[in-house]
Amino acid sequence: MEKITMKEKIDVQKPDDLGLDISDLRYFLVMLLFSAVVFFLLISQRLTNTFDGLWNNTWFFGGYWQVVTGRWLWPVIDALRFGIQTEPFNSLLTLSMSALAVTLLRKFFTEKDSVVTYLAGMAVLASTVTEIQLSYRFQSPVFGCSFLFSVLAAERVVRAADFRKAVVQGALLLVMSLACYQTSLDNFCLLLLTYLLLLLFRNVDREKVHAYIGRSLCSAAAGMVLYFLLTKLIVWACGWQMASYNGGADVSVLSILKNLPNAIAETYQLFGAYFFQNYYRHNILQPVGFFVLVFLALSIGLLNRFRKMLHRKNWEYILLGVAALIVLPIMCNAIMLITSEAV
């Protein structure tokens, strides 16, 4: 039997199939157990942040504020879990959804688990982002849902059988993600961009790359437009008005275009501040230049990939790859293009 190359693996992926098996269940359980151990102290001691995470009652239902800030799926999710927000139920529910999202996420980039895939998943789940979400105990499951929906949306764009299904399914899941928490748009955009880089590096057929770019752009545009229209409709049907929180009430096509140059510049500033400064404290290794070393290692790997592309003299893929790397900081902060107040 002929050996199947990495390029061919992409070509023969089954469409419309999540492809979950016993290895995925094992990975999910390991991720869930690991994250529960990491955050055991926070969960067992019922620790919360000093802002709106201080909730002592045992139940909570979202309502007016969640809807007028564009998070209209929040009350639905609260109702589905009967408003329960006691520990450890809420935190384990959140960690379960995050672990499932990471389980699906890794399948974008590999068909076989290794030490690297486990360490990568653990790094995502053990991040300060997860800790902050858990500290808002009454709303942490909504964060988990938003993360999971954003990964599922990107997964549908990649694996759906045809263009129409990819756009429709991806857009609907993106709407659900945004209706929980808008900043998950960043997850969706970054996943699609990194998968594009993977296709380019693996030298996948040009037609498939073009089709993938079309799927990605159309699903993202359709999802954001549909979310905007549904949000306006739901708020109007409730007899309310959009809140000015994070500039949400002023968002329009004109405002986005008008603020686009400043928003793009701010995405690069945030990217640099997050990884190369101590403004955002999220890793004890930051002061010793940990991320500089990580970026150097990644840069060596990327340069090697581009060297192979140069050897093939595939100038279109080289240009697409360079463009993807240039816009990567923008995709990491895509929500900033909508409203620059969403920091």
Language model region names:
Residues 102-103, 272, 281-316:
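Hydrophobic, aromatic-rich transmembrane alpha-helices
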Residues 64-88, 92-97:
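Short hydrophobic/aromatic helix or loop-helix immediately within or flanking a transmembrane segment
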Residues 150-167, 201-206:
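Membrane-interface transmembrane helices that cradle and orient dolichyl/undecaprenyl
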Residues 166-182, 187, 193:
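Membrane-interface alpha helices of multi-pass inner-membrane proteins
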Residues 188-221:
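Perimembrane helix-loop-helix junctions
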Residues 38-39, 43, 213-291:
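Membrane-lumen/periplasm interface segments of specific transmembrane helices
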